[in-house]
Structure formats: C-alpha cells, structure tokens
Amino acid sequence: MDPTYERIYAAVARIPRGRVATYGEVAAAAGLPGRARQVGYALHSLPAGRPVPWHRVVNARGEISPRAEPRFGTIQRKLLEREGVAFDASGRVSLARFGGAVRRAKGRGR
C-alpha cells in the first residue's frame, strides 16, 4: 500500500464518531498540507472492507462532495446522520459545530 495513502487513512481514522473533517484538514493532519485532492484520491482507492470512516470527510463548504456514483453521497449522509451529524436545508454540515475534529499525529515532524 502507498505510504502516503496509509498516512491519509490514519488521519481519517482519528476523526471521532459524530464529527467531520474537511479534505484539507485531513491532508494537513497527514503531514500533506495543500494536498486535499490527494485525500480524495486516497479515499476513492480505499480497499473494500478497510475500517476507515471515509464518510466523516466533507468538502471545505461542509458538503458531501459529488461522486461518479451518486448513491455513495446518500450512503455518506445516512452514516453521518446516524452518528448525530446534522445537515442544514442546503445539505451542509456546520463545520463550526461538527468540524475541526482531526489533529496531526504526535511525532510527525514534517
């Protein structure tokens, strides 16, 4: 497995239940500032059955990012709602209330 993707998956795994993080926050927490798109690529490549809470990652506007397969957006929203994450009428999560949940791992000196 790509070591960069492993760092991303480890950062996503640190997002607590009922909280979200943006692609950019995950990138920074993985020691990859400015590489939000790489987080998207890594999550798209997540092996089936790998216990990484991919559904807790949203875009910088607090929205579920569009996907080639729309049903995954529906699944993501349902998973977040089951964890107590609320969406407004525009389909956004309040990042002030539910965001900022991922931190950089200790010992990462990059």
State where each predicted segment sits.
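Nucleic acid-binding interface residues in structured DNA/RNA-binding domains
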Residues: M1-R110
